[in-house]
């Protein structure tokens, strides 16, 4: 059934009443993380997922001549390549860690560089500057790597007195994605990072009969990992239904 918003048009209680005995949550991570710096609401600043979605839907996009992409994942490299293909004269990715810590797949990074995308490592934005309501530049600071953080990567630390400005007319924000889980009933527990908690063996959530998999559980990952989670959950759901006599 299409055109249905779970949590608005129907909820889990309604699904149980309709006779469903198991639910699988696979909503992905389609909510963009927000960059909490000044100037994020200027014209010419767009989230990478919104940008890629619009391009994929065939919408006409106004592409700047000089584009900066902020982030270091596969979405950042996809957005950078897309902007270049759509006519941008110069596209630069700003990433706050080193090449070794970059979460994007190595081949994605190589493809972007081969197509002409420039990558500046150990650089973070401090402020997005604008003129007449439109982005005109990004004030940046150079970083150095410190001790390992909770992600297992070395923590980027701003270098005092290293601020500089990059002029551009478009900023694409690709600093991460998260699942939109506002529709979930309170009985379903979340992990510390805001994803759905599941039993790693059965993929069942804290609510009996409800399973989950893919990016909604792991955070942004690969299609292969999502397919694997789906297969694992399907087996568990089958076993669960058999236990009910279904």
What residue ranges belong to the model's regions?
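Feature captures the FAD/FMN-dependent oxidoreductase FAD-binding
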Residues: 1-38, 127-139, 144-147, 168-172, ...
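Generic hydrophobic/aromatic pocket-lining and core-packing "Φ" positions
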Residues: 12, 80-81, 223
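Cofactor-binding loop segments of dinucleotide-utilizing enzymes, especially the Rossmann-like FAD-
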Residues: 72, 95-98, 215
